[in-house]
Each structure stands twice: as C-alpha cells, then as structure tokens.
Amino acid sequence: MNLTHLDEQNKPKMVDVSDKDNTTRIATASGIIEVGQAAFDAVIANTAKKGPVLQTAVIAAIQGTKQTSTLIPMCHPLMLTSVKTDIEELPELPGFKLTVTAKLTGQTGVEMEALTGVSVGLLTIYDMLKAIDKGMVIRNVQLEHKSGGNSGDFNRA
C-alpha cells in the first residue's frame, strides 16, 4: 500500500497538492452525544449553568472546522467557503445529533474539516454539561457524504 503521507524514506510529509485542479469539494459529517435526562432537559430549557449549550456548540463546530490544520498535522490550511451546522434533538436517547457540512473550491478535500467540526461541537456539549452528567457518550462520528476531487464521491448508505 502506498501511503501518500510518507516519503521514500518512510518519513512523514504533507502531500503536495499543487498540481491538482481547483474543484468544488463538499463534505458532510455527523455524530451523536447521548446525555442523561437531566442534562437533556437543561439544554431544552436553556438552564445549563455555562450558558446556551446548542448555540455554543454550533460556534465551536464552526471554529473546529476552521482550525483543523492546526490540530491534525498533515491537513492543509484551507480557504473554506462555507460551514453549515445542524443540531437535531433526540429525545428518545436522550441526546443530540450534530451535522457539519464544509465546502470550498480548492485542491484538496474537506472531510477532515467536517469531522473535526463535529468532534469539537460534541466535545463542547460535553464540556458544558459535565457538571450535570459525567456519563455522556460521544459516538458515531462519521463521514456521511463527500463530493469533488479525484477520489470520487462517497455517500454513506
């Protein structure tokens, strides 16, 4: 297997994308946080002591998406053109599903940015609710869709 992040001497390197075409690239990722009923109720009633949980998670998800290259060593700094978020209430768990879609026109994909945005957003929910519930579970952080670039499209079935 040829790993693109290793050079001929097996040393880590950032992939050279300078010869790639600029194309529109979109990636959507999602993840779930399961919380206890008291934590869920605090979010819905907007009574969590640290403030508005879901609004803060959205801002954190956008920031996480933008900061991916500072967190993941081999990710290129990207000029994102759009970051969209959605948080779905899951009262049956109880919990929340966070979805992040990142978009750009450039030479490399935005999958890691969407995944990082989801991760940071869910971690923010955890941070803001940990005084109420330490047993929260973050799960199923995954790529849902990707389009653009040489590797083709991906859609989770």
From Swiss-Prot:
<keyword id="KW-0456">Lyase</keyword>
<comment type="subunit">
    <text>Homohexamer; trimer of dimers.</text>
</comment>
<dbReference type="GO" id="GO:0061799">
    <property type="term" value="F:cyclic pyranopterin monophosphate synthase activity"/>
</dbReference>
<dbReference type="InterPro" id="IPR047594">
    <property type="entry name" value="MoaC_bact/euk"/>
</dbReference>
<keyword id="KW-0501">Molybdenum cofactor biosynthesis</keyword>
<dbReference type="GO" id="GO:0006777">
    <property type="term" value="P:Mo-molybdopterin cofactor biosynthetic process"/>
</dbReference>
<feature type="active site">
    <location>
        <position position="127"/>
    </location>
</feature>
<dbReference type="InterPro" id="IPR002820">
    <property type="entry name" value="Mopterin_CF_biosynth-C_dom"/>
</dbReference>
<protein>
    <recommendedName>
        <fullName>Cyclic pyranopterin monophosphate synthase</fullName>
        <ecNumber>4.6.1.17</ecNumber>
    </recommendedName>
</protein>
<dbReference type="InterPro" id="IPR023045">
    <property type="entry name" value="MoaC"/>
</dbReference>
<dbReference type="Pfam" id="PF01967">
    <property type="entry name" value="MoaC"/>
</dbReference>
<dbReference type="InterPro" id="IPR036522">
    <property type="entry name" value="MoaC_sf"/>
</dbReference>
<comment type="pathway">
    <text>Cofactor biosynthesis; molybdopterin biosynthesis.</text>
</comment>
<comment type="function">
    <text>Catalyzes the conversion of (8S)-3',8-cyclo-7,8-dihydroguanosine 5'-triphosphate to cyclic pyranopterin monophosphate (cPMP).</text>
</comment>
<feature type="binding site">
    <location>
        <begin position="74"/>
        <end position="76"/>
    </location>
    <ligand>
        <name>substrate</name>
    </ligand>
</feature>
<comment type="similarity">
    <text>Belongs to the MoaC family.</text>
</comment>
<feature type="binding site">
    <location>
        <begin position="112"/>
        <end position="113"/>
    </location>
    <ligand>
        <name>substrate</name>
    </ligand>
</feature>
